[in-house]
Amino acid sequence: MAQIFNFSSGPAMLPAEVLKQAQQELRDWNGLGTSVMEVSHRGKEFIQVAEEAEKDFRDLLNVPSNYKVLFCHGGGRGQFAAVPLNILGDKTTADYVDAGYWAASAIKEAKKYCTPNVFDAKVTVDGLRAVKPMREWQLSDNAAYMHYCPNETIDGIAIDETPDFGKDVVVAADFSSTILSRPIDVSRYGVIYAGAQKNIGPAGLTIVIVREDLLGKANIACPSILDYSIFNDNGSMFNTPPTFAWYLSGLVFKWLKANGGVAEMDKINQQKAELLYGVIDNSDFYRNDVAKANRSRMNVPFQLADSALDKLFLEESFAAGLHALKGHRVVGGMRASIYNAMPLEGVKALTDFMVEFERRHG
């Protein structure tokens, strides 16, 4: 079978080594004669999987001991509701920074539970889309927390600054598309959440990192399935968890540790992004409209100078083994998602194709 590189924004490409191990263990896991999908989540075998996954995840991000790691359901959209329901306490407002599609989606959901103080951080710099630096973000005095999205998959916008708003500001962040791709200082956040389907594992699992002093404040109307304290008290097994996604995510964590951890991923991700943006910037045939300071290293949207060639580009790239390059309907054009599992070889194959496509059609 020819080599396929999957540039999907999520569910995204998984490491080949992880898929191979899962394939080998699919019907006989741990010598039990059954699949990991068939064993009890409360049995000692799966409990070991869960405990190792949490330990490895903590190691990868250096999660401080006063933070809890929860393995939840509901994806990022579930957390759009869970954050206000768990963190508001007796306050009625929260600060939300709008820098793109997913931040706006979080704001829309939050309006069901509080009065968001929305700061629009989107700006245009020299005709390119950008985000105001954190020092210019206007926060309110009475907010329960401040929420933002460090990486906008659709817009191709990243906010790589580390929050520094003082110890009294609880920062909540949607890291779904950038978790584990670069080192972060977890202690600067109150809540970090991430859907698994981009840099962690299969869809269906959501990881929440929450500072323990924020537990026990859930709104009385908060559904139990979204209550951080309930999940913490039950070892993330309040109900039957997505066991296969948990198991496979655990394999990804071990793969990351075996390949240099988050620091090494950071270096490789920088190389991949520089290679792809380099081809775009050195061409009049392709363009990206995000200011360099805010370009995402995970999701690279780009347009062809002649949109009439879009269909042909997608057909020929697919035939070349470069899949899922169609841009989101909101932005159009193309989008290459190059998460941790995408090897440098895959980005090189894409850029080689782009150069050749331009030679033939430019």
From Swiss-Prot:
Record keywords, A-Z: Amino-acid biosynthesis, Aminotransferase, Cytoplasm, Pyridoxal phosphate, Pyridoxine biosynthesis, Serine biosynthesis, Transferase
One Gene Ontology cellular component annotation held by this UniProt entry: cytoplasm
Positions annotated to bind pyridoxal 5'-phosphate: 76-77, 102, 153, 174, 197, 239-240
Involved pathway(s): Amino-acid biosynthesis; L-serine biosynthesis; L-serine from 3-phospho-D-glycerate: step 2/3; Cofactor biosynthesis; pyridoxine 5'-phosphate biosynthesis; pyridoxine 5'-phosphate from D-erythrose 4-phosphate: step 3/5
Compartments reported by the entry: Cytoplasm
Cofactor: how bound: Binds 1 pyridoxal phosphate per subunit.
Annotated PROSITE patterns: AA_TRANSFER_CLASS_5
Pfam family membership, one: Aminotran_5
Catalysed reactions listed for this entry: O-phospho-L-serine + 2-oxoglutarate = 3-phosphooxypyruvate + L-glutamate; 4-(phosphooxy)-L-threonine + 2-oxoglutarate = (R)-3-hydroxy-2-oxo-4-phosphooxybutanoate + L-glutamate
GO molecular function: O-phospho-L-serine:2-oxoglutarate aminotransferase activity; pyridoxal phosphate binding
Record-listed L-glutamate binding positions: 9, 42
Residue list for modification N6-(pyridoxal phosphate)lysine: 198
Top-rank lineage group of the source organism: Bacteria
EC number of this enzyme: 2.6.1.52
CDD domains according to UniProt: PSAT_like
Major localisation: cytoplasm
Cofactor: pyridoxal 5'-phosphate
One annotated GO biological process: pyridoxine biosynthetic process
Subunit comment: Homodimer.
Record's function text: Catalyzes the reversible conversion of 3-phosphohydroxypyruvate to phosphoserine and of 3-hydroxy-2-oxo-4-phosphonooxybutanoate to phosphohydroxythreonine.
Protein name: Phosphoserine aminotransferase
Taxonomic source organism: Shigella boydii serotype 4 (strain Sb227)
Name of encoding gene: serC
